[in-house]
């Protein structure tokens, strides 16, 4: 994942949310079931630290984004009703273009991790390792496969949309 140059002032800790913060909140929202959007979720806490917002502020931003989601409204979930013009603009920009959102946000996250001296995270590898059985005995075979780019983001977005059930 390429590291990109983050603009000065992109991550203020108070006041209006920037476009970068809103995009990263939207990226997180796409991958997280609605019931997990709260300030005590360790993933919310971790991302909030990177984007210099409080966990509760990030959770509320995600719930504001949920108010724009027709799938949530269809389930009777209204989210919070304070979506900003920035929330709407980011929703409109990326709703039909997941690839651009995933690439841009993962590059921003990687840049934030580098800036904060955190180890890089290969989300595809982390997802694969989570499914590794504890019994490491078995046969080996050689395989050549094509692998979808940004598969981990796509998988988390789909699972989040279906309540972690397919």
Model-derived regions: residue spans:
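Short, Lys/Arg-enriched anionic-surface-contact patches
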Residues: 7-28
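Short Lys/Arg-enriched helix C-cap and helix-to-coil transition segments
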Residues: 70-90
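Intrinsically disordered, low-complexity linkers and terminal tails enriched in Pro/Gly
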Residues: 10, 106-137
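Major-groove recognition helix of helix-turn-helix-like DNA-binding domains
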Residues: 53-69
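Short, amphipathic alpha-helical interaction segments positioned at domain boundaries
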Residues: 88-107
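Short, charged surface segments at domain edges that flank catalytic/cofactor-binding sites
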Residues: 126-165
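Short helix->loop/beta-hairpin flanking segments within DNA-binding domains
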Residues: 29-39
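Short alpha-helical "recognition helix" segments of helix-turn-helix
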Residues: 43-49
């Amino acid at each position: 994942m390429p590291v990109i140059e983050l603009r000065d002032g992109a991550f203020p800790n108070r006041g209006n949310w920037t476009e970068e913060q809103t995009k990263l909140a939207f990226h997180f929202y796409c991958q997280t079931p609605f019931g997990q959007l709260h300030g005590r979720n360790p993933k919310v806490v971790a991302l909030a630290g990177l984007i210099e917002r409080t966990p509760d502020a990030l959770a509320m931003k995600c719930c504001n984004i949920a108010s724009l989601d027709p799938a949530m409204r269809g389930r009777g979930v209204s989210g919070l009703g304070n979506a900003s013009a920035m929330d709407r603009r980011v929703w409109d920009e990326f709703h039909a273009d997941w690839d651009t959102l995933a690439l841009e946000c993962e590059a921003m996250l990687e840049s934030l991790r580098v800036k904060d001296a955190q180890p890089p995270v290969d989300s595809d590898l982390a997802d694969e390792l989570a499914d590794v059985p504890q019994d490491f005995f078995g046969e080996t075979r050689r395989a050549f496969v094509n692998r979808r780019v940004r598969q981990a983001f796509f998988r988390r977005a789909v699972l989040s949309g279906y309540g972690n059930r397919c």
